[in-house]
């Protein structure tokens, strides 16, 4: 089997495992919290950072690859690694600023995404989102690292990146339902 075929099979297997765990994550949430304010608040809080950063992260990754290749071709491996470090640092700083802004304006952001939420569900969604939006820096770092790995022709590890995240979410759901639902977003940041 050729190297490309092995990479394709590995990527398909990684994606399949990630999708199965994603399904398991949804089953765990439904089993633990059912159709409740906790599950609604958690789903909104998970989606807000994803929606905010997916477009930005995908754009960063798409722009990073050709720029890295250009720097690598013109100036060599050392310069391309320095370029990667600079991009990484800039993305982390931008994400930290976005996290701070998001934390300040969480109630307004949640109300845009969770139309109809009131009372305890709205309060929980705001709390969950405020905690989870602090993870934007990690999301930004993961997009740059995925692009870097793709440049280095490592496609399996980026395909596996959702696996530990889904395992962490499932574990957080199980622990939080036994102890306290307020732990749910905090456990995801550990």
Which ranges hold each PLM region?
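Membrane-embedded alpha-helical bundles of multi-pass transporters/translocases
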Residues: 1-190
